[in-house]
Amino acid sequence: MLLSIGMLMLSATQVYTILTVQLFAFLNLLPVEADILAYNFENASQTFEDLPARFGYRLPAEGLKGFLINSKPENACEPIVPPPLKDNSSGTFIVLIRRLDCNFDIKVLNAQRAGYKAAIVHNVDSDDLISMGSNDIDTLKKIDIPSVFIGESSANSLKDEFTYEKGGHIILVPELSLPLEYYLIPFLIIVGICLILIVIFMITKFVQDRHRNRRNRLRKDQLKKLPVHKFKKGDEYDVCAICLEEYEDGDKLRILPCSHAYHCKCVDPWLTKTKKTCPVCKQKVVPSQGDSDSDTDSSQEENQVSEHTPLLPPSASARTQSFGSLSESHSHHNMTESSDYEDDDNEETDSSDADNEITDHSVVVQLQPNGEQDYNIANTV
């Protein structure tokens, strides 16, 4: 599921482009403006601007050619006189109707019933173009012919020179252009879909990254299982590989399974916030049995060679004893000491317990020149 969302987001730009082109190509077939080309018997032509109605059929893309007839009565609020060649299928007639007195849909419906193929409604005492509409759904369902609206001066010119009686004819030509809202609405829809997909992708990516980081980091309970050693002069450790400062008496050192030691204040944030590997040898720290998935992922990552891969394997780095590493002979001893130094508040309790037991045995630690420690136990009765 997550993979499919990622693949969908990768192609969001392509999806947006394809949908935009298809929607615009479809909407461009819907004209919102048109022109009337008028021709008289001398083949003189004139163009008049009009505005198609919001109901009825659209003008065909090639235009509609026909003969212009004045409506009788002019307002067409009642049944009008049919065209002279109503029964001749070869002739197409367009009626010119005056505005006012009744609704636009009634005028156009009466023209359709009379046998006209289109209707032209003109304004009265104005050349303003009006978008004709209707709220009567039943009437709108009955209208099948296209209709346009023109100004009064255009209507007067058509009556004077381009009517059927004067040997003229007209062509209603659609103009394939769209207003801003026709472009804006599909654009906003597509942009909204893309934004939703982007938000889904970002949330999915955030959840995946957070889950991956949690698997690659050490939990608090796992960190507490790592031994802590209190540094004393003569110990094998010398310098913290993170802060590059020499250890001082009383410093708390975190001992990792690879025998590398660091300041607790230095290595703890690395293990809990960055990655649960040794900063020097990259060996995994405390692999948990219940975290098999993270172990598998980490092992696969460690097997891949990259610029962060250490030059020496973990076993070799342990033998070099660099940056405060601890030999195997002392790691077990430090594991036993860690319980004594895990918390400073428990030192007094531990020391008092040791005083009670000193009457039975005492431990004498002698440092040998070769760096190894011999333990001699003597009875002090």
Curated annotation (Swiss-Prot):
TM region(s), chain numbering: 183-203
Compositionally biased region (Polar residues): 317-328, 365-381
Region annotation Disordered: where it falls in the sequence: 285-381
Signal sequence interval, chain numbering: 1-34
Keyword Signal included in the entry's annotation: yes
Tissue specificity comment: Expressed in the brain, heart, kidney, liver and spleen. Higher expression in adult tissues compared to the embryonic counterparts.
Acidic residues compositional bias, start-end: 339-357
Segments forming RING-type zinc fingers: 240-282
Effect of C266A: Loss of E3 ligase activity
Catalytic activity: S-ubiquitinyl-[E2 ubiquitin-conjugating enzyme]-L-cysteine + [acceptor protein]-L-lysine = [E2 ubiquitin-conjugating enzyme]-L-cysteine + N(6)-ubiquitinyl-[acceptor protein]-L-lysine
InterPro entries to which the protein is assigned, alphabetical: E3_ligase_sorting_rcpt, PA_dom_sf, PA_domain, Znf_RING, Znf_RING/FYVE/PHD, ZNRF4/RNF13/RNF167_PA
Function: E3 ubiquitin-protein ligase that regulates cell proliferation. Involved in apoptosis regulation. Mediates ER stress-induced activation of JNK signaling pathway and apoptosis by promoting ERN1 activation and splicing of XBP1 mRNA. Also involved in protein trafficking and localization.
Domain notes: The RING-type zinc finger domain is required for E3 ligase activity and for promoting ER stress-induced JNK activation and apoptosis.
Protein name as annotated: E3 ubiquitin-protein ligase RNF13
Record organism: Mus musculus
Native organism taxonomy: Eukaryota, Metazoa, Chordata, Craniata, Vertebrata
